[in-house]
């Protein structure tokens, strides 16, 4: 009897259920972060190095080749130094570790809130599409010509539970305090702005995120594709200029002193990773892991998969690539892309980069953890397979030190998910709004 009443209520009130569940989970996160800080020992890894780098910077030394700490030189762009200079001042010159932990716990809570907001937009769109389809079927509309294009995702409200269950992710914030926490917070703010149609602000925050750590560049091919799909080539250029201008403005003090040193240090793509820290390639022999040919092979496969997925997405576009490139030049209004289409492309292209990364360290789990539930629910896996996938992934990232088995499990699971995503039908690219025939009439896309 209870089941007969509860299930229909949940089905008909998914948005209310989402907000209720999200509220409880936020309270849970506040409590769990407090417990972690109070009862789990802090682990020093990079915080002291960040502090030492900031101290050199605050002394007025702007030559990037001279900014370093115990574990090495500063290999992050200028935004990293600005952010950690602020944290340095907030934590009594970096000495108040407990205060720093609480700040990073607050950053975790804020990031979780933003991610919940992104998933909320996704869930609302899914419910709207399901309702519209049901209404169309009931009204017997003759939409046979559009049936092939009527593909959308069914994202359930309870998916956000899986965003709060990772031991590793909690430790990255409250116990490790890596700069990845800052860069991913800025990225998710950027992504939320983008799905709300605030592209200029989205590009600004995206570039700020890159200025803290370059891993966010893994999303850049997807961002470029979405910009072209929305605005066309000419109207995309100002958005790219925003991204570039942010990097230049933040780097001015360092570019004026030693521009070559800054560019080589802050954007060093040839940096060699240590085999002992790799999470994803432990099953390879060390000599192969360190081989430059292996790095070039991974880069080639990375680019190949990006091209294959873009071809898949372009086929969904009416008029193909030529229509995308023409849009800005023939004065067409911007298109309003669907939330789930934006998220699927951004998250999938990032997963490609993660899967074929030269090396993943433990904190790099944060690069894609919050995207996994969405990607898994974008496939036709059953619930048990989806949960099993997340358990395998969590196991691999919590195995320390990594083993041949754990790293092989991680690579295979990521690779299988990529293949599954490739063979899924491409979802609708446009939002199902009455005003979307000419872009947007009521709400401007900026």
From Swiss-Prot:
Keyword vocabulary terms for this entry? Endoplasmic reticulum, Glycosyltransferase, Membrane, Transferase, Transmembrane, Transmembrane helix
Give, as in the UniProt entry, the pathway in which the protein acts.
Protein modification; protein glycosylation
Q: What class of enzyme is it?
A: transferase
InterPro entries listed in its UniProt record: Glycosyltransferase_ALG3
Could you tell me the superkingdom of the organism this chain comes from? Eukaryota
Q: Note the topology in the membrane.
A: Multi-pass membrane protein
Q: Which GO terms describe its biological process?
A: protein glycosylation
**Entry GO terms, CC:** endoplasmic reticulum; endoplasmic reticulum membrane
Q: What EC number is given for this enzyme?
A: 2.4.1.258
Q: Which residues cross the membrane?
A: 17-37, 103-123, 155-175, 177-197, 214-234, 237-257, 294-314, 336-356, 372-392, 407-427
Key word Cytoplasm present:
no
Q: What is its main location?
A: endoplasmic reticulum
**Record field: catalytic activity:** an alpha-D-Man-(1->2)-alpha-D-Man-(1->2)-alpha-D-Man-(1->3)-[alpha-D-Man-(1->6)]-beta-D-Man-(1->4)-beta-D-GlcNAc-(1->4)-alpha-D-GlcNAc-diphospho-di-trans,poly-cis-dolichol + a di-trans,poly-cis-dolichyl beta-D-mannosyl phosphate = an alpha-D-Man-(1->2)-alpha-D-Man-(1->2)-alpha-D-Man-(1->3)-[alpha-D-Man-(1->3)-alpha-D-Man-(1->6)]-beta-D-Man-(1->4)-beta-D-GlcNAc-(1->4)-alpha-D-GlcNAc-diphospho-di-trans,poly-cis-dolichol + a di-trans,poly-cis-dolichyl phosphate + H(+)
Q: Could you tell me one molecular function GO term of this UniProt entry?
A: alpha-1,3-mannosyltransferase activity
Where it sits in the cell: the answer is:
Endoplasmic reticulum membrane
Pfam families in the record:
ALG3
Q: What's this protein's family per the entry?
A: Belongs to the glycosyltransferase ALG3 family.
The task this protein performs is described as:
Dol-P-Man:Man(5)GlcNAc(2)-PP-Dol alpha-1,3-mannosyltransferase that operates in the biosynthetic pathway of dolichol-linked oligosaccharides, the glycan precursors employed in protein asparagine (N)-glycosylation. The assembly of dolichol-linked oligosaccharides begins on the cytosolic side of the endoplasmic reticulum membrane and finishes in its lumen. The sequential addition of sugars to dolichol pyrophosphate produces dolichol-linked oligosaccharides containing fourteen sugars, including two GlcNAcs, nine mannoses and three glucoses.
Q: What is this protein called?
A: Probable Dol-P-Man:Man(5)GlcNAc(2)-PP-Dol alpha-1,3-mannosyltransferase
What gene is this protein a product of? alg3
């Amino acid at each position: 009897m209870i089941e007969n009443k509860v299930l229909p209520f949940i089905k008909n009130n998914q948005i209310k259920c989402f907000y209720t569940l999200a509220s409880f989970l936020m309270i849970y996160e506040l409590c769990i972060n407090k417990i972690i800080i109070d009862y789990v020992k802090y682990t020093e890894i990079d915080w002291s190095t960040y502090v030492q780098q900031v101290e050199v910077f605050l002394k007025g030394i702007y030559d990037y080749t001279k900014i370093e700490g115990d574990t090495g030189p500063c290999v992050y762009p200028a935004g990293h130094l600005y952010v950690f200079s602020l944290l340095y001042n907030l934590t009594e010159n970096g000495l108040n570790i407990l205060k720093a932990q609480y700040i990073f716990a607050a950053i975790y809570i804020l990031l979780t809130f933003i991610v919940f907001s992104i998933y909320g937009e996704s869930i609302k769109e899914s419910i709207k599409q399901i309702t519209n389809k049901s209404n169309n079927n009931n009204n017997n509309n003759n939409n046979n010509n559009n049936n092939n294009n009527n593909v959308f995702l069914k994202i359930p409200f309870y998916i956000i539970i899986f965003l709060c269950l990772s031991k590793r992710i909690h430790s990255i914030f409250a116990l490790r305090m890596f700069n990845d926490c800052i860069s991913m917070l800025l990225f998710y703010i950027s992504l939320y702005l983008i799905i709300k149609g605030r592209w200029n602000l989205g590009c600004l925050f995206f570039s700020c995120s890159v200025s803290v750590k370059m891993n966010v560049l893994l999303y850049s091919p997807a961002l470029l594709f979405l910009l072209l799909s929305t605005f066309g080539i000419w109207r995309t250029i100002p958005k790219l200029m925003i991204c570039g201008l942010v990097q230049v403005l933040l780097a001015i003090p360092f570019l004026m002193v030693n521009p070559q040193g800054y560019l080589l240090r802050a954007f060093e793509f040839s940096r060699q990773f240590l085999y002992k820290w790799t999470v994803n390639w432990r099953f390879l022999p060390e000599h192969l892991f360190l081989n430059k040919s292996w790095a070039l092979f991974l880069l080639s496969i990375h680019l190949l998969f990006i091209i294959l997925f873009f071809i898949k997405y372009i086929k969904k576009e009416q008029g193909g690539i030529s229509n995308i490139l023409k849009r800005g030049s023939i004065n067409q209004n911007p298109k309003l892309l669907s939330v789930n289409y934006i998220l699927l492309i951004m998250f999938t292209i990032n997963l490609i980069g993660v899967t074929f990364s030269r090396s993943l360290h433990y904190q790099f789990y944060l690069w894609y953890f919050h995207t996994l539930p969405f990607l898994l629910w974008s496939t036709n896996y059953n619930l048990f397979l989806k949960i099993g996938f997340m358990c395998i992934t969590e196991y691999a990232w919590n195995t320390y030190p990594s083993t041949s088995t754990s790293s092989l499990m991680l690579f295979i699971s990521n690779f299988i998910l990529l293949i599954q995503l490739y063979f899924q039908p491409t979802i609708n690219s446009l939002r199902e709004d009455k005003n979307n025939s000419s872009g947007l009439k009521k709400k401007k896309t900026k």
